[in-house]
């Protein structure tokens, strides 16, 4: 168990008055968690301090070689005023999988969860009260060695910051338009596609901007070898309901193993759906749309939760989905998952963790 030193701010920030205008990741709570790592000593100096900048040398490793990872989680306020997390142990384990791939030291999962809970408890007044809003939690770790040599660092900093946030997409739960990217790729076998590291997201920005210029909300990535099979959307995993069955890319190293994805697959199987995790060609998706068999498409992720898709655009061909409306299964998944997260529905799966 961590011995966390807490230093509370003497100048608390003014909290947002209108939670309908929170946006995503633009406002930050009063405090942050910090912990440092030194080779031979391990993790030490766990602390919660007032939120603010810290000084770093221009030659710090992370600036040059991108040895960093992060996670994305949320804290929810129930109608009874209780605060709870959603499957934080899954985030802790995925964080360590990312750390291993980037040659960084792991954090014991119980310490990771303890740190998150401690910070949320200190800043519990920052957890929004309004329906659909939550406290977004961003744990991250960076290499803090100073020097330009290319090697695994011997010093790291683990930090957690929190941001009260509303809907991730400006459209809210309205169905979005997705552009299928067939020039740029997000990941390839043997690389870092399954991790949450900044490089994956940096490499996706250009394609995302080009898609936005064309009026699309996100990019759907194809596999990096044949540029043929669907993998994931920029900030989401993605699922297709075709002729009553659910298809999604398998987590074989190029797709992020999403916590929301995992939860939705468990829900779907519990409801009797056949879920097929494997290769799905974009050509087969478009053919299913032409034949009227593509019933629903939806993205899944911590930030967006469930995001319905109304249109796929690939090589000038357009697949219109669900008549541009939210499909019934998509709506049921959203209502069920958010119901559990916000404490409106019974958590029979044991997914929520109280912050007390």
Please give the residue ranges for each predicted region.
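Helix-start/capping segments and mature chain N-termini
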Residues: 1-119, 140, 147-356
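Extended, Lys/Arg-enriched charged tracts that mediate electrostatic binding to polyanionic substrates
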Residues: 128-138, 142
């Amino acid at each position: 168990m961590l011995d966390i030193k807490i230093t509370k701010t003497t100048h608390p920030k003014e909290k947002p008055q209108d939670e309908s205008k929170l946006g995503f990741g633009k406002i930050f709570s009063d405090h942050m968690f910090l912990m440092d790592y030194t080779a031979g000593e391990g993790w030490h100096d766990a602390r919660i301090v007032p939120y603010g900048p810290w000084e770093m040398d221009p030659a710090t490793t992370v600036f040059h070689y991108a040895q960093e990872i992060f996670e994305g989680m949320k804290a929810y306020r129930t109608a009874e005023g209780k605060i709870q997390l959603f499957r934080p142990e899954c985030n802790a384990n995925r964080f360590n999988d990312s750390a291993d791939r980037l040659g960084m030291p792991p954090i014991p999962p119980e310490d990771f969860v303890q740190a998150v809970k401690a910070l949320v408890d200190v800043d519990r007044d920052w957890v929004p009260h309004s329906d659909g809003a939550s406290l977004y939690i961003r744990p991250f770790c960076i290499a803090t060695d100073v020097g330009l040599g290319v090697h695994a660092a011997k010093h790291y900093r683990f930090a957690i910051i929190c941001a009260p946030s509303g809907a991730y997409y400006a459209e809210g739960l309205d169905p979005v338009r997705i552009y299928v990217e067939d020039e740029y790729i997000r990941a390839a076998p043997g690389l870092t596609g399954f991790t949450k590291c900044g490089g994956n997201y940096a490499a996706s920005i250009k394609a995302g901007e080009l898609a936005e210029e064309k009026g699309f909300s996100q990019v759907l990535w194809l596999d990096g070898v044949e540029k043929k099979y669907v993998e994931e959307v920029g900030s989401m995993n993605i699922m297709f309901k075709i002729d009553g069955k659910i298809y999604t890319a398998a987590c074989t190293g190029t797709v992020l193993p999403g916590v929301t994805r995992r939860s939705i697959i468990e829900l779907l199987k519990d409801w009797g759906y056949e879920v097929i995790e494997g290769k799905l060609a974009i050509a087969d998706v478009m053919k299913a749309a032409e034949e009227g068999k593509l019933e629903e498409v939806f993205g899944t992720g911590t930030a967006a939760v469930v995001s319905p898709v109304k249109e796929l655009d690939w090589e000038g061909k357009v697949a219109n989905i669900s008549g541009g409306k939210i499909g019934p299964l998509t709506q049921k998944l959203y209502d069920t998952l958010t119901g559990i997260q916000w404490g409106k529905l019974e958590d029979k799966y044991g997914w929520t963790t109280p912050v007390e």
